[in-house]
């Protein structure tokens, strides 16, 4: 036996007896499976077997067998392993339950040949019913791995059923993404153009210009945008939503107690409003003790600290009421608990309550890091972030808050684990609340542009994700991780990727879709991204025949929508 010592107690058990291409698996892209959180008496069956590496051991409800965790926290080793190949994506799934205890964390861990542990996903398991555990791994080298269950309870006795590891090539994964994007981001619109007598108009020309996309890919900005006309022009020509990196934070607006200064934030907001750019508020408070104004930690009286904290909430939220799309009310309050330690366990929940009273229409986020990007995280895991939001919404008076999850997305400079990321988004999305990626970046590295595109496409292809903000900019902005343009505003390779995705996801109003109704069918169908459009219908032979109208294409309208246009001619 080998003991694990990595800073916290882990109990693990090796999965046994593997073979290829057999059994049952969960499709990681299935809408019916992706947000599944209920505990079921019997795991549902699936006919999905393509690309499957299947574990044959399945412990059923009426069996006396169970996988027991060694009480010493040791690994019980077996010799059999699974061979994984670099460049492939492996999606893991299993139905798990507890024989003893309840509501305990159960996760999957992959141990590589060099002894490194890769955490692949986790779930809260329950007693006497089955919960779906999902995750996965993207190996950076080919080799064999051992697969373990882990639990934070040394007394845990875990039963598992239908344990599977499904292999995808990157091309297969991308194809799945594209298919899902067509379902969740677009709808087919059929135009039927007729005269008042219902006779079809042959050869009508339909021009469609998008005025407001439903899904926004945005970018953060900082105070340097006030100092550079080139930065302002570069930004306004691309992005329709932003957040300010530091300019709205408490340690910026009140460096000295009682002396508030919102000059930079106000000026940046004015620039955004003048250019039709939405602003997401970041942040009212920050639960990290090191991220307070320097004078705040010196306050020893809890009543005094409460007074200045309430003053801060009232000040910033009243000032920007109705001007922002959302707020990080208490930033990173899963990782940190400064206000809870100083003011009580319900501090965060009570601050969300006050924020809701001050601006009930704004979306309020729990905003955390290492939730979707770092699979070794033990603090702000998807399960714990979900539970924090549930705790806030359960606080008296908070049930009507427009809640949302902010997954920051500070990725390491290496191949992202897309299978883990998708499973993490599934867990967060099971709340039924919007998810935004709020601070996406990655240190400079070879293939940065490839990795960033993979990350952004993974988010865009998930039904719970409603928008993305990257922490990036041109060289003059000082964003030294995701630099999108040089000092002359010429694109970097990563900048080319962002421009490509903006064009793909947000149809430019300067390049309208133009087509002619079919002379035989007298109707035309086009696939449109969800959003708002201006539509013009005219005819090249009839100069007086023209009509224009606004059109909103939404997911709620279904996969197909019929637009009937009646021409007065």
Swiss-Prot record:
Organism: Arabidopsis thaliana
Carbohydrate-modified residues: 197, 261, 307, 346, 490, 536, 544
EC number: 3.2.1.8
Pfam families, per database record: Glyco_hydro_10
Keyword Hydrolase: yes
Listed GO MF terms: endo-1,4-beta-xylanase activity
Keywords noted in UniProt: Carbohydrate metabolism, Glycoprotein, Glycosidase, Hydrolase, Polysaccharide degradation, Signal, Xylan degradation
Protein name: Endo-1,4-beta-xylanase 5
Top-level taxonomic group: Eukaryota
Role noted for this protein: Binds to and hydrolyzes insoluble and soluble xylan substrates.
């Amino acid at each position: 036996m080998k003991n694990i010592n990595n800073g916290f107690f882990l109990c693990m058990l090796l999965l046994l007896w593997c073979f290829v291409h057999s059994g049952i698996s969960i499709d990681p892209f299935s809408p019916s499976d992706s947000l599944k959180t209920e505990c079921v008496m019997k795991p549902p069956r699936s006919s999905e077997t393509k690309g499957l590496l299947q574990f044959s051991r399945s412990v059923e409800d009426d069996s006396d067998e169970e996988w027991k965790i060694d009480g010493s926290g040791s690994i019980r080793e077996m010799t059999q392993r699974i061979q994984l190949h670099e460049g492939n994506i492996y999606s893991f799934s299993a139905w798990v339950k507890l024989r003893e205890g309840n509501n305990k964390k159960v996760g999957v861990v992959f141990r590589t040949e060099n002894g490194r542990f890769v955490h692949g996903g986790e779930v809260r398991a329950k007693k006497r019913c089955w919960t779906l555990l999902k995750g996965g791994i993207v190996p950076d080298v080919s080799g064999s791995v051992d697969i373990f269950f882990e639990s934070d309870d040394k007394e845990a006795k875990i039963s598992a059923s239908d344990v599977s590891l499904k292999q995808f090539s990157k091309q297969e994964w991308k194809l799945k993404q594209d298919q899902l994007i067509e379902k969740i981001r677009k709808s087919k619109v059929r135009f039927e153009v007729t005269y008042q007598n219902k006779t079809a108009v042959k050869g009508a020309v339909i021009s469609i210009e998008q005025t407001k996309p439903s899904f926004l890919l945005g970018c953060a900005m900082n105070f340097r945008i006030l100092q550079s006309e080139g930065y302002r022009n570069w930004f306004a020509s691309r992005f329709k939503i932003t957040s300010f990196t530091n300019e709205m934070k408490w340690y910026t607006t009140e460096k000295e107690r009682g002396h508030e200064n919102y000059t930079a934030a106000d000026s940046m907001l004015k620039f955004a409003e003048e250019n039709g750019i939405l602003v997401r508020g970041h942040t009212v408070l920050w639960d990290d003790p090191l991220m307070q104004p320097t004078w705040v930690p010196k306050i020893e009286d809890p009543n005094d600290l409460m007074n200045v904290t309430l003053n801060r909430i009232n000040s910033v939220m009243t000032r920007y009421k109705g001007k922002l799309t959302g707020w990080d009310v208490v930033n990173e309050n899963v990782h940190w608990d400064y206000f809870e330690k100083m003011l009580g366990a319900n501090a965060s929940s009570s601050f969300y309550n006050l924020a809701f009273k001050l601006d009930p229409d704004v979306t309020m986020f729990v905003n955390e890091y290492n939730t979707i990007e770092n699979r070794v995280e033990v603090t702000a895991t998807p399960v714990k972030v979900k539970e924090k939001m549930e705790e806030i919404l359960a606080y008296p008076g908070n049930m009507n808050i427009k809640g949302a999850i902010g997954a920051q997305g500070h990725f390491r400079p290496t191949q992202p684990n897309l299978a883990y990321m998708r499973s993490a988004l599934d867990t967060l999305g099971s709340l039924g609340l919007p998810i935004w990626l709020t601070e996406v970046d990655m240190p400079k590295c070879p293939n940065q542009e490839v990795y960033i595109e993979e990350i952004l496409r993974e988010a865009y292809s998930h039904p719970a994700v409603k928008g993305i903000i990257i922490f990036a900019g041109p060289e003059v902005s000082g964003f030294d991780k995701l630099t999108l343009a040089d000092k002359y505003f010429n694109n970097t390779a990563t900048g080319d990727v962002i421009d490509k995705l903006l064009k793909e996801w947000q149809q430019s109003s300067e390049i309208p879709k133009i087509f002619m109704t079919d002379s035989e069918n007298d109707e035309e169908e086009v696939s449109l991204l969800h959003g708002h459009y201006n539509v013009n219908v005219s005819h090249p032979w009839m100069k007086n025949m023209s009509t224009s109208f606004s059109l909103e294409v939404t997911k709620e309208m279904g996969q197909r929508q019929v637009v009937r246009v009646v021409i007065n001619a």
